[in-house]
Amino acid sequence: MFEATTILGYRGELNHKKFALIGGDGQVTLGNCVVKANATKIRSLYHNQVLSGFAGSTADAFSLFDMFERILESKKGDLFKSVVDFSKEWRKDKYLRRLEAMMIVLNFDHIFILSGMGDVLEAEDNKIAAIGSGGNYALSAARALDHFAHLEPRKLVEESLKIAGDLCIYTNTNIKILEL
């Protein structure tokens, strides 16, 4: 279900300055064929104050993006309130409960994974989250690099996604990154 991509979100503080980034690869796979190598699966929302990315069915993900963006607008960009209301709406709607997609949403203060079942998961360290077929590779690499390498945030996201792209057949190294 969640094959064909890797999305990595990373937030924190460096030199007393907050940062938030999201990155993703560009591969789209249909069965055992790569049909696109440069897709964009990340975007900024609410006047560039929130970042998001998706893994899973593209059509389902765009439905989730639209719904989340509408709720985020109604909550005036409050990410925490938006993910809670998003989860409530998702669970109420029988159609949404069948969508095969996951999202990461983050800002300078929070990072969340929105699961295909309507769950809201805050990243364990409130710093790094990853989804998709290469998500565990990217998450492991990002945690190690964050702990030991002391890289600039953009470089950490890029290198973590490259590692995932080298290991996961559904992920490539055509990486796109957005930052707040």
Curated annotation (Swiss-Prot):
* Activity regulation note: Allosterically activated by HslU binding.
Which Pfam families does this entry report, sorted A to Z?
A: Proteasome (PF00227)
Which UniProt keywords are listed?
Allosteric enzyme, Cytoplasm, Hydrolase, Metal-binding, Protease, Sodium, Threonine protease
User: Which positions are annotated as binding Na(+)?
Assistant: G165, C168, T171
What intrachain disulfides are recorded?
none
Query: Key word Transcription regulation present in the record?
Result: no
GO terms, molecular function: metal ion binding; threonine-type endopeptidase activity
EC number, UniProt record: 3.4.25.2
Entry's localization field: Cytoplasm
Q: Which NCBIfam families match?
A: ATP_dep_HslV, PRK05456.1
Q: Subunit info? A: A double ring-shaped homohexamer of HslV is capped on each side by a ring-shaped HslU homohexamer. The assembly of the HslU/HslV complex is dependent on binding of ATP.
Tell me the function of this protein: Protease subunit of a proteasome-like degradation complex believed to be a general protein degrading machinery.
Give the family this protein belongs to, as stated in its UniProt record: Belongs to the peptidase T1B family. HslV subfamily.
What name is this protein filed under? ATP-dependent protease subunit HslV
